[in-house]
Amino acid sequence: MKTLETQPLAPDCCPSDQDPAPAHPSPHASPMNKNADSELMPPPPERGDPPRLSPDPVAGSAVSQELREGDPVSLSTPLETEFGSPSELSPRIEEQELSENTSLPAEEANGSLSEEEANGPELGSGKAMEDTSGEPAAEDEGDTAWNYSFSQLPRFLSGSWSEFSTQPENFLKGCKWAPDGSCILTNSADNILRIYNLPPELYHEGEQVEYAEMVPVLRMVEGDTIYDYCWYSLMSSAQPDTSYVASSSRENPIHIWDAFTGELRASFRAYNHLDELTAAHSLCFSPDGSQLFCGFNRTVRVFSTARPGRDCEVRATFAKKQGQSGIISCIAFSPAQPLYACGSYGRSLGLYAWDDGSPLALLGGHQGGITHLCFHPDGNRFFSGARKDAELLCWDLRQSGYPLWSLGREVTTNQRIYFDLDPTGQFLVSGSTSGAVSVWDTDGPGNDGKPEPVLSFLPQKDCTNGVSLHPSLPLLATASGQRVFPEPTESGDEGEELGLPLLSTRHVHLECRLQLWWCGGAPDSSIPDDHQGEKGQGGTEGGVGELI
């Protein structure tokens, strides 16, 4: 059920028909060269020093035109991580009950860098992200305790809409805060990943400031439809070697992008039984950052982040007419147990041991293909959502035979509609195809044992497909938009409109935008309480939000 794929490699780690012409380096490119001697490369930045950045962030694509099609040139230098092989994990969890005392092994203390690591390549000057060395870090709360509060309508702060209006059929496909909260990553139908910095106005304590429209500091162009994307699990902007993003697109390898320069750092390639390149449908880094888990049809492939290329461990999820069938569409790791969950378009959920991928449980209950998974911080519960399915299901690993409870949301299309939990696990937030954002308090179950809705508001009139809660500030990010298929118009003598085409989208209100909402109290005068629910100051395109 588990095999190791170690086929002989060409010098460039891929067949000749997959190699594009070498790309011209970006002006901000790191001095990496595939044929360069590592001794000639400058040493990496000191671990304790934050990257020194330009006062003006770089706006615009940092990827050369040659990277837009085919497979960008991969780097021969492996990704530098501070983690070795995974430690020994706890014994396999018995059938459907998990021990509450089982936990992931503690990280081993980082030793001194080896000579090879000390002479490794420099990973970029860091001109994309803003320098926060003189400002309070996003993850450092200082003397202020920021907590999410949904007792009032969230206040709109800022957003981005002009960036996505250049193409008439463009729309957002989700957003994700970086693990350290310094920036946010978006995906859209134009096959571009964009990185936005945290609005600098948030650092003006004690001042009334106007929020300007957000502008991306990096654009990373993929060659085709992006299937999935994710941040490195231990990403920190203070350590450039941990600041990168993984993405997978149709008929392309898995790409690792530098979050400071927008350049390609490495590629991971998977091949089918015909030795043809196949794309991953889902991506997830392991909690310790040493492995990248990728979902394929009836298979999960595990790559080592220290060895880019095609070498990987293949873990079958379906064999001998048993197991989890279908494309593995989403993967999530438990924060407290040595296991991970997989959702498939075959409407099933599977639990697997982290160390060897052995199956622990197979669950079913959704009416459509699974599109998103999220674990509760306690590690005992996880949530699942599916396409064309009006239910969010909560599962308890200690009694995983059936859902603990379900919550209602409107999902009427095949689009991936995200949901998220705040860092404490108290609030569950979900988007919907109607545009409404719903909030539940998971710590306050109602009379029937399931959480009661706390708030529901309408940030815009189009589909809200992405929601993401900031890891340390009470900031909610929402992404909107959907693919619209023209509908046939009415014909006949009565009510016929002259000049109206046979196919029309006149009944659809298109709004493609990224928006940030303040969902907390106001310890200082920079975010006053008495402005809750007011129109944001990000421009005339800014949203107000309506209670439902």
From Swiss-Prot:
MF annotations from Gene Ontology: histone binding; identical protein binding; protein carrier chaperone; protein-containing complex binding; protein-folding chaperone binding; RNA binding; RNA folding chaperone; telomerase RNA binding
SMART domains xrefs: WD40
Pfam families, from UniProt?
WD40 (PF00400)
Instruction: Name where it mostly resides.
Output: nucleus
Sites of Phosphoserine modification: 26, 30, 54, 64, 85, 90, 112, 114, 491
Q: Give a GO cellular-component term.
A: chromosome, telomeric region
- Which InterPro entries does this one have? SWT21/TCAB1_mRNA_Telomere, WD40/YVTN_repeat-like_dom_sf, WD40_repeat_dom_sf, WD40_rpt
WD repeat ranges per the UniProt record: 167-206, 222-267, 272-313, 323-364, 365-405, 411-450
Which regions are flagged for Low complexity bias?
Answer: 15-31
Localized where? Nucleus, Cajal body; Chromosome, Telomere; Chromosome
Fill in the PTM field for this protein: Phosphorylated at Ser-64 by ATM in response to DNA damage, promoting its interaction with histone H2AX and localization to sites of DNA double-strand breaks.
What is known about its induction? (Microbial infection) Over-expressed following infection by Epstein-Barr virus.
Q: What else is known?
A: The mRNA encoding this protein plays a critical role in the regulation of p53/TP53 expression at the post-transcriptional level; it is involved both in maintaining basal p53/TP53 mRNA levels and in p53/TP53 induction upon DNA damage.
From the record heading the sequence, give the disease linked to this protein.
Answer: Dyskeratosis congenita, autosomal recessive, 3: A rare multisystem disorder caused by defective telomere maintenance. It is characterized by progressive bone marrow failure, and the clinical triad of reticulated skin hyperpigmentation, nail dystrophy, and mucosal leukoplakia. Common but variable features include premature graying, aplastic anemia, low platelets, osteoporosis, pulmonary fibrosis, and liver fibrosis among others. Early mortality is often associated with bone marrow failure, infections, fatal pulmonary complications, or malignancy.
* PANTHER family in the cross-refs: TELOMERASE CAJAL BODY PROTEIN 1
Q: What does this protein do?
A: RNA chaperone that plays a key role in telomere maintenance and RNA localization to Cajal bodies. Specifically recognizes and binds the Cajal body box (CAB box) present in both small Cajal body RNAs (scaRNAs) and telomerase RNA template component (TERC). Essential component of the telomerase holoenzyme complex, a ribonucleoprotein complex essential for the replication of chromosome termini that elongates telomeres in most eukaryotes. In the telomerase holoenzyme complex, required to stimulate the catalytic activity of the complex.
Protein name, please? Answer: Telomerase Cajal body protein 1
Species of provenance: Homo sapiens
Q: The organism's lineage? A: Eukaryota, Metazoa, Chordata, Craniata, Vertebrata
